[in-house]
Amino acid sequence: MAQGTLYIVSAPSGAGKSSLIQALLKTQPLYDTQVSVSHTTRAPRPGEVHGEHYFFVNHDEFKTMIGREAFLEHAEVFGNYYGTSRETIEQVLATGVDVFLDIDWQGAQQIREKMPQARSIFILPPSKIELDRRLRGRGQDSEEVIAKRMAQAVAEMSHYAEYDYLIVNDDFDTALSDLKTIIRAERLRMSRQKQRHDALISKLLAD
């Protein structure tokens, strides 16, 4: 069976990364593509399901996993830990399923060190003006928070060149088409096609 591909997807807040990934998944069968499910120490929110939205663990369990080097990457955010399990990712990839990991540039660097075969995609907004409009469109942040998010966005975008692919999300449908094209091209790589069609190739080359 052909090994699945791990896709690292990063973008500044407001670039439309999550919307693009969710739209992509709606066009792909579950046996082809999944989103990575992270471990976290924070409490479940209403409606969240263990194993579907996150793997919820306590701090001691999480620290034990860190000690076992069980994570491809992990970080602390506002007192809670979040991490991507190497075992979970590898088990899914071994079934031939592609996995999407929505993560920032720092987490992406950690994963590249441990899984250099992963493919990475960076998504940019079409302009700072449009990014500002999208951030304001949420209608829930103060001017101070928006200014902070814009500064964080610029810092995040400065790492775009570290990625394999670059998508500019100006028109959503075009950006989604670009994302699909990347996935299709990766699935046609020699290494994957050779595994997928091994029996056929053997028959074609038999004396």
Curated annotation (Swiss-Prot):
Gene Ontology MF, one: guanylate kinase activity
Cellular component terms per the entry's GO annotation: cytosol
Domain of life assignment: Bacteria
Family matches, as InterPro entries: GK/Ca_channel_bsu, Guanylate_kin-like_dom, Guanylate_kinase, Guanylate_kinase_CS, P-loop_NTPase
UniProt subcellular location: Cytoplasm
Gene3D superfamilies, sorted: Guanylate Kinase phosphate binding domain, P-loop containing nucleotide triphosphate hydrolases
UniProt EC number: 2.7.4.8
EC primary class: transferase
Keyword list, A-Z: ATP-binding, Cytoplasm, Kinase, Nucleotide-binding, Transferase
PROSITE patterns found in the cross-reference section: GUANYLATE_KINASE_1 (PS00856), GUANYLATE_KINASE_2 (PS50052)
Domain Guanylate kinase-like: 4-184
Keyword Protease: no
NCBIfam families xref list: guanyl_kin (TIGR03263)
Protein family membership: Belongs to the guanylate kinase family.
Protein name per its UniProtKB record: Guanylate kinase
Source organism of the structure: Salmonella paratyphi A (strain ATCC 9150 / SARB42)
Lineage: Bacteria, Pseudomonadati, Pseudomonadota, Gammaproteobacteria, Enterobacterales
Gene field: gmk
